[in-house]
């Protein structure tokens, strides 16, 4: 089968764990492969639960540089969208839910996290973004070593899985979704505001294939919905190196 032209194929990437180590900058060899091997062959986009500033830091650039470098940059699950270097669309969870509901959710999370005993706790337990509320039991200001320590304990004890279950039990009919993302946190957002949200920005682009690459593709992970959506061809990866290996095979690079 002949290759489709670049304008008809999109490679769409989660960031943490897919193109970069969690919350770390992209490796130079991964970046060179994406820019020199992949971009000449297909259109390339990013979709992340993080805000644009964090995405840009991980992509080793300023926000302006990164939105110009990629065909599409969907930060905060696509609630903030840039197409070909230009701002396109923005939604607000605060306007959607209202202040009372936002505070009800935040207060529950703070109380729940206050009763957890962990090896360490640091700062920024709740981060309010345009498209979601991010809650972090260990605190987002933890060091890299503390992050890894929490991730190891979480893998054994299911700290975030239990937290997610408590949220689902407390807010069963709220219209909210709760997804485990990255190594240390949970994303809270209105149902349908998961990473699939970015697909509405692609409906008129004429793509015949949208390949999505993510690492949190199991049910409950923040890549699951987009990975399993019938509009995408989902690829589950285990590391940036695995992402490159799969890209080489899929696109014959």
Where are these regions (language model features)?
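A generic structural motif
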Residues: 39-43, 173-177, 208, 230-232
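Asp-based phosphoryl-transfer active-site loop
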Residues: 4-25, 46, 73, 199, ...
